[in-house]
Amino acid sequence: MKKLVLLSTMLLMFSFKSVAQDVTPQLTAFPEFRPAIAYMADGKKLEIPMANIFLKNSSLLYISGELTKEANTKSLLRVDFKDRTYFRIDSVLAYQVDTVGANALFCAKVLDLKAYRQLIANNSNITNLDINDLASMNILQYTTIDINDMKDIHFPVIPLYYYRLDNQFVLVHERNLKRVLNKEKRRRMESVMNLPDFSWTNEKSLLKILEVIQ
């Protein structure tokens, strides 16, 4: 079993299951590290035997010797895994959910740091001194720990959605979209938003918007 460099304290051995949002028992997109090909901003292509996506900030992790390291996202264009490709969008790596014509929907899953800190602050077993370290995210500094030891930890995660519109990436948010869409496309978007089952976190809803603003 590969060791994942993750936590500097075991004070987080409590569950996030009670939170009414998506949670994950792991801090990586995949349960195990796997081969990947990284396409760099300088034109180079690197084959990485053991790689993963770190949910703290949706960045690339790779194993080098006995260490797990985090790549500089700015140096990447995309990362190809066997069944999923991640593209650099802003400061995160996001995978393609689906396409609609020439446009597409992308998603990056990251830790919900606000909910994470609040749950830490509400835990009566953690002292004020511990809270300062945990809330500052020092617990996510690297120290070797076996993934199997993390079964009882559940981390809150949130999806960040992006549209690729006319070869430009836009963070999916009503305000952002209204800035880039013309009056007619804004009207079409609002018609979808008024549907009873619409949600900004529902991929079917977001793809429906992408369809009507073509």
What label would you give each PLM region?
Residues 1-25, 209:
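Bacterial Sec-dependent N-terminal signal peptides
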Residues 51-172:
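Aromatic-patch recognition
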Residues 7-8, 45, 179:
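A broad, structure-centric signal for solvent-exposed, well-ordered loop/edge residues
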Residues 20-76:
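Short, extreme N-terminal leader segments that mark the start of a protein/domain
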Residues 146-210, 214:
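A short, solvent-exposed beta-edge/loop patch
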